[in-house]
């Protein structure tokens, strides 16, 4: 049957048709091999944008550094990083004038955070550059290694468990003449296997001590490791992203806390809120501009794009901003906040793995590590790579490149948003002192600019003024990639606005389907995605019902759990049929056990086990919720878990779903092969570290408690807490005298063991 496609749209407003333009089917592109080339591109580009700056040499590390601040004013439209300090400070002053007390209040909020944050804040986050091993590690391990090295070098402030005290150690470590670290290495040897009598390679792991002098340590402390950004759609070329080490992380966290607190108070800021809250905030700004432009004024909106936002930003500018924002605050607070930008002014970019060479004729492959690029003969490289290496050579030290200007991706998102908003703020009539005025939205490097004026010339003049003002603080609006429209139609951070934000449901399509975690989580995530899209993305009831049926079908095929009375034959059908036949209340069987689906769009918020609990046979209940089931390695399931869902565009989102622990919440065992590598010791450290952290959280459920005065370690804090809790429980009759005595005895034993150690 032929369908005329235009018929589909007869009743649909044009803006709703956006979901039909969905380009992102299939998998996004991933990068393979080394990111060295991309990192060199970033370093070279950043220096090119600031090339008219002044060169200097860092006295501690010997690194050549380029400082473009207060450089020549631009004479053309090329992107440049020559921010003018006085312009940035003036923009900050005007921002404060329009929002009285904003900086003061944010500083007070941040000061409180600084004093309360525990060092385990740094265990959040994924891959982190571990300076002790000179490669990436999970955040928790990198932190543990850093603290271990600090302690063995006599730096012990961190034992209090406060982040600020850990940072004191970081500062002290930079003054030390040398640091001793422990590195892992591998020995391989050939031995005969007793069973098979074949020769096998046996790997043993060794740890060795290594001393770093001040210069080498500083280089590592200031290093950002680089990787290639994966899964970026709509780009031909990959690009590099950076991951900083533990010395920088804590300082950045406090700066971003301050900036976040400021952004929350700025109506033009698209950060730190998200989702519907963000849409509401942005819709307000648009409404304000449209209301004011009544009949007399024209109103136009630019969907903006900035050229190489973070390569033209400069840490020295951020230092100036922080100095201004905190100007009436206590000295210690100003110092803590100024360290991050200072470290970034002296940062080093690690070039990654280096290059891989193959000789077709001799079937040889060899890796040229980044450290060798400084003095290898360039005749082996193709022309473009040769140019890159020649350009970067003066900047190289120990396989890292000195990169003073520029910010690297995703480091100071909040603070750079404050800078962007401060320019939007200058669009008020009392500052432009003319007939045009502007306002807009800023979220990291993405912006939308709304300009109002009595006529087209005024609009043009307003845009020009905005463009030039941005140039003065190192923001380069791209004239090629920005476009202007009558206000009412624009795009901002992948939200499309047409007389209101349009739900672009198709963006969420990749997150529909079976996640592949386990039967319990997958069911829960699947229905939650549908529920969330009904709430946030105009997913209508009929479509949602269809999505649900498709999901259940998909789920049954994935886990081979077709209904017990079906004709479909799979590996599991024999067992499932048997279960079906011996179950009295068949409606109580979970879908993953061959039961019927009881979900409809009204009850998506209820976990399946709860939905069917009353319908289950008693022995089936006992089987589903059985903590002693030997086949399920149970992690303790919180009532809410987080799943990572991939929308088509933008970063992976974290989504909460209800998690009910059943025998279907299994966790696949870890691949054994890791246990024979140098990672093994690291893995054991990591597990021990996680056990300690979760134990600690049992004692202090909020894990952000105010520290009891005079207590120096986690163990002592837990013992003292255990004693207090036991006494309260004993006096209120919740525990017996014998139990109370036993707890006290255990506490004393622990203290005794600590003293002996």
UniProtKB/Swiss-Prot annotation:
The keyword NAD does not apply. One of its GO terms (molecular function) is nucleotide binding. It catalyses: RNA(n) + a ribonucleoside 5'-triphosphate = RNA(n+1) + diphosphate. One of its GO terms (biological process) is symbiont-mediated suppression of host mRNA transcription via inhibition of RNA polymerase II activity. Its EC number is 2.7.7.48. InterPro entries: RNA-dir_pol_NSvirus, RNA_pol_PB1_influenza. Residues 249-256 are annotated as: Promoter-binding site. Belongs to the influenza viruses polymerase PB1 family. RNA-dependent RNA polymerase which is responsible for replication and transcription of virus RNA segments. The transcription of viral mRNAs occurs by a unique mechanism called cap-snatching. 5' methylated caps of cellular mRNAs are cleaved after 10-13 nucleotides by PA. In turn, these short capped RNAs are used as primers by PB1 for transcription of viral mRNAs. During virus replication, PB1 initiates RNA synthesis and copy vRNA into complementary RNA (cRNA) which in turn serves as a template for the production of more vRNAs. This is RNA-directed RNA polymerase catalytic subunit.
